[in-house]
Amino acid sequence: MECDRISTLPDHLVAKIVSYLGIKDSIKTSVLSKRWEFVWLKVVGLDLKNCDFPPNGIASQMVVNKYMEFNSGLHMQYFKVNFGGNTVCTNRFLEWIATAVDRGVQHLDAENKNPVIIKEFMPKKIYKSKTLVSLKLAIKIFLKARHFISVFIVLQGQSIVQFSSRCGTFS
């Protein structure tokens, strides 16, 4: 006779186990039982590509929105989102980045190949983060002045310190 040992584990440990699954499989665990319904939302980070939920990225945006809304008090270890071409442009992309920084994200990796119309380049909170260890941004943006800019930034560990110490805006 088989024994169900996973059901006896505490929620935080079950969430840790689920965090090793891909996002699609993590979400699938929500139908296992009432206890598992929100486990995928309790993982310490989000790693999502819009190709996980084709065809147009709307489902991907819904997953990110649900995760951000459910975990308002959670400290995030990582936030990785990738919206490729052919997806519906989201106006919440930069808001998600700011929210992740607010939650003490350590590893931020955000890519959006769809142009985003913005007033400012990046949320100012990103420059003041005390927890950010690695930063990778690849975002196409339209500034209000109607100039098109494509940005790709990759900073890790000491590079962030060097980058921020050499820029007066960050001091």
From Swiss-Prot:
Pfam families linked to this entry: F-box
CDD domains with a match to the protein in the record: F-box_AtFBL13-like (cd22160)
Domain spans labelled F-box: 3-49
Name used for this protein in its record: Putative F-box protein At1g32020
Native source species: Arabidopsis thaliana (Mouse-ear cress)
